[in-house]
């Protein structure tokens, strides 16, 4: 870590610090994550594709980097850039195979350190997530020029990104023990902990590209269909929405997480919108309006469904309801068909990192598939 670096926002705000990770230029949407742990899971989450993540935890890197906690295949880092306050000068964890900065350099991720991340977060909280860039080394230039580079990039609004993070080829994750069910999982940016949760429950997962057709899904004769998390604007995902409607029409049990919640919502007739600064953290409370229970959840989303708590609405597939909302701001956190054949949540029951309050939803999906046999 050495040399000057700058985080430049599209509204002209500039934060000067030191280079952290690779040297050069990176562009993306500036967002912040309030998680106090789990930075490796955050960096490797495909949902952060094309985003510069600002860490609110004051010190990052204490536990280094290991070969077990990544949420992407091949341990790929998906964030566009990383901004931290105080990078740990030493690694202290028995599983660590190297330092965080070494891994950022190896994967050519441009970052910045020694900036006032609290000031950055307050700015983004007030002004909203926005286009940004991190510049160091030869990429540094006059601030006005850097602002123009930042403004010239594509907005996250209207960005179709699921295909950029999805697997190009189908693959299978085998269950632990005898197979009980087969699930077709549409990879829109799937985290590796999701198939692991299925595997622990005896589910064989056929992970399919985001371009998969309903015919390809039906050929697998799955007991259920899963819609994964992922990046980008759900309003662009017309193909996936159309496939989801065919799945609903066929009566196949369906479960969605995060981006998958927005896809199911769109398939049921709801619209989506871009949030001011989104939900990104591991301590976000969600109300289940069927039971009144509150779960503390892990979340990572900058778009949401339009709707109100407990709202019922008609769809071509029967009555549906807004099943969950955020206790902090009322944002829609789940939808379902009234007959229970399809349901989804905006948060991450697989956690990684985060609480396991909502892990029971995987068992709920199994109950749905059992009842459909």
From Swiss-Prot:
Protein keywords: Amino-acid biosynthesis, Arginine biosynthesis, ATP-binding, Glutamine amidotransferase, Ligase, Nucleotide-binding, Pyrimidine biosynthesis
CDD domains linked to this entry: GATase1_CPSase (cd01744)
CPSase: annotated span: 1-179
Annotated function: Small subunit of the glutamine-dependent carbamoyl phosphate synthetase (CPSase). CPSase catalyzes the formation of carbamoyl phosphate from the ammonia moiety of glutamine, carbonate, and phosphate donated by ATP, constituting the first step of 2 biosynthetic pathways, one leading to arginine and/or urea and the other to pyrimidine nucleotides. The small subunit (glutamine amidotransferase) binds and cleaves glutamine to supply the large subunit with the substrate ammonia.
Enzyme class of the recorded protein, top EC level: ligase
Active site residues of this protein: 258 (nucleophile), 348, 350
Pathway info: Amino-acid biosynthesis; L-arginine biosynthesis; carbamoyl phosphate from bicarbonate: step 1/1; Pyrimidine metabolism; UMP biosynthesis via de novo pathway; (S)-dihydroorotate from bicarbonate: step 1/3
InterPro entries: Anth_synth/Amidotransfase, CarbamoylP_synth_ssu, CarbamoylP_synth_ssu_N, CarbP_synth_ssu_N_sf, Class_I_gatase-like, CPSase_GATase1, GATASE
EC number: 6.3.5.5
Protein family according to the UniProt entry: Belongs to the CarA family.
Matches recorded under NCBIfam families: CPSaseIIsmall, PRK12838.1
Protein name in the entry: Carbamoyl phosphate synthase small chain
Entry binding sites for L-glutamine: 47, 230, 232, 259, 262, 300, 302-303
GO molecular function: ATP binding; carbamoyl-phosphate synthase (glutamine-hydrolyzing) activity; glutaminase activity
Biological process per Gene Ontology, one example term: glutamine metabolic process
Glutamine amidotransferase type-1 domain location: 182-373
Subunit structure as annotated in this protein's UniProt entry: Composed of two chains; the small (or glutamine) chain promotes the hydrolysis of glutamine to ammonia, which is used by the large (or ammonia) chain to synthesize carbamoyl phosphate. Tetramer of heterodimers (alpha,beta)4.
Substrates-to-products reaction catalysed: hydrogencarbonate + L-glutamine + 2 ATP + H2O = carbamoyl phosphate + L-glutamate + 2 ADP + phosphate + 2 H(+)
């Amino acid at each position: 870590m050495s040399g000057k670096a700058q985080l430049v926002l599209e509204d002209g705000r500039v934060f000067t610090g030191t280079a952290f990770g690779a040297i050069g230029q990176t562009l993306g949407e500036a967002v912040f994550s309030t998680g106090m742990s789990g930075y490796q899971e955050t960096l490797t989450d495909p949902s952060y594709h094309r985003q510069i993540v600002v860490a609110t935890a004051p010190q990052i890197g204490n536990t280094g980097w290991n070969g077990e906690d990544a949420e992407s295949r091949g341990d790929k880092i998906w964030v566009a850039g990383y901004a931290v306050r105080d990078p740990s000068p030493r690694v202290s964890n028995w599983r660590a195979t190297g330092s965080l900065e070494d891994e950022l350099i190896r994967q050519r991720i441009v970052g910045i350190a020694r900036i006032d991340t609290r000031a950055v977060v307050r700015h983004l909280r007030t002004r909203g997530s926005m286009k940004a860039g991190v510049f160091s080394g030869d990429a540094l230039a006059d601030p006005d020029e850097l602002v123009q580079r930042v403004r010239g990039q594509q907005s996250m609004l209207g960005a179709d990104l699921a295909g950029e993070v999805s697997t190009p080829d189908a693959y299978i994750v085998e269950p632990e023990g005898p197979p009980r069910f087969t699930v077709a999982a549409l990879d829109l940016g799937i985290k590796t902990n999701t198939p692991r949760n299925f595997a622990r429950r005896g589910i064989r997962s056929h992970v399919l590209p985001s371009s998969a057709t309903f015919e390809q899904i039906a050929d697998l004769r799955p007991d259920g269909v899963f819609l994964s998390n992922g990046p980008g604007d759900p309003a662009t995902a017309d193909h996936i929405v159309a496939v989801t409607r065919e799945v609903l029409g066929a009566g196949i049990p369906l479960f969605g997480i995060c981006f998958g919640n927005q896809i199911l919502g769109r398939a049921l007739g709801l619209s989506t919108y871009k949030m001011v600064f989104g939900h990104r953290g591991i301590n976000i409370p969600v109300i289940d309006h069927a039971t009144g229970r509150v779960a503390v959840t892990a979340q990572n989303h900058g778009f949401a469904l339009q709707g109100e708590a407990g709202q019922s609405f008609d769809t071509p597939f029967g009555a549906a309801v807004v099943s969950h909302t955020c206790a902090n701001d009322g944002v829609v956190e789940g939808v379902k068909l009234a007959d229970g054949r399809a349901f989804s949540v905006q948060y991450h029951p697989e956690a990684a990192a985060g609480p396991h309050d909502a892990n029971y939803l995987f068992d709920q999906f199994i109950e749905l598939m059992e009842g459909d046999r």
